[in-house]
Amino acid sequence: IIMDTFDPKHIYSDAAKLARLKDKKLFLFDIDGTIAVGDTLYEGSADLIRYINDIGGRAYYITNNSTKSGLDYVKKFHDAFHLDSTEDQFITSGYMTLRFLKENYAEKKIFIAELRKNGLHVTEVCEENIDCVVVAYDSELNYGKLTEVCKVLFTQDVPFYGTNPDLRCPIDFGFIPDCGAICDMIT
């Protein structure tokens, strides 16, 4: 059942929709802008997730947010949403980018900061022999960082990847520029 067609605030009053849920065991949810914004769950989301657990289902969460790890989301779901979860329930764009880079650039030099802690050789300064450039959402983005990325891309023939194509990220007051907007600005 897609969240756009299922109104979770009526979960306990709509018998037909409840019956459809009982046959399902796997549920995939986007987080930001779908079941939550910031540290606030949308009305009915917690009830729906608890109901899924009650019927023996399993919820997985997919997000384009590359700034948080699966463990960060476990903590957020516990502390902010009062929901129990495990790290394997979260698939982030950062995690998927990491998997891609480990498979394709394990011994190469990568221009990004966040992947160093996962065993990849990364750099945040413009230097020769960079093998690829990866751009992610960056809340501390500045002109200096943009200049460094552009210098690498214009002086070296390297692939350029973004962790997600989203132009904007939903937050409590509306939207802010996301990875896709940063990538568009660079290109």
Annotate each language-model stretch with its function.
Residues 1-31, 35-187:
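HAD-like aspartate-dependent phosphatase fold
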